[in-house]
Amino acid sequence: MPKRKAAAPNRAFKVADQIQRDLTELIARELKDPRVGMVTIQAVEVTPDYAHAKIYFSMLTGDVTETTEALNQAAGFLRNGLFKRLHIHTVPTLHFLFDRTTERAADMNALIAQAVASRSKDD
């Protein structure tokens, strides 16, 4: 049996990018859960078989645990919305994870500022 040709390597990136755009719109316009406030989708990682997608998000205010729980409970609703928009055979199961990158960057900036301030005091 001949080998099946592998999909283009950047197709997964294109699908992830489209999922990110569509999810941003779905959350902002159609999700009515009060536990979900100002959520920003930072990144989407799709498995090679498109069965699962990790959705990394950040938020300005609110409880991280509560928002993560609300988004994971709404995953079926959001997946159904993606099914109507995407034209792929399998719409992935969505797994929402809080992205702590911005928090870590702020902590690093504070540490750098502290080091610079202590260095200038030493001079």
Swiss-Prot record:
Single Gene Ontology MF annotation: ribosomal small subunit binding
GO BP, one annotated term: maturation of SSU-rRNA
UniProt xrefs under PANTHER family: RIBOSOME-BINDING FACTOR A, CHLOROPLASTIC-RELATED
Function: One of several proteins that assist in the late maturation steps of the functional core of the 30S ribosomal subunit. Associates with free 30S ribosomal subunits (but not with 30S subunits that are part of 70S ribosomes or polysomes). Required for efficient processing of 16S rRNA. May interact with the 5'-terminal helix region of 16S rRNA.
Subunit composition and interactions: Monomer. Binds 30S ribosomal subunits, but not 50S ribosomal subunits or 70S ribosomes.
Family: Belongs to the RbfA family.
Name of the featured protein: Ribosome-binding factor A
Taxonomic lineage of the native organism: Bacteria, Pseudomonadati, Pseudomonadota, Betaproteobacteria, Burkholderiales
Gene name linked to the record: rbfA
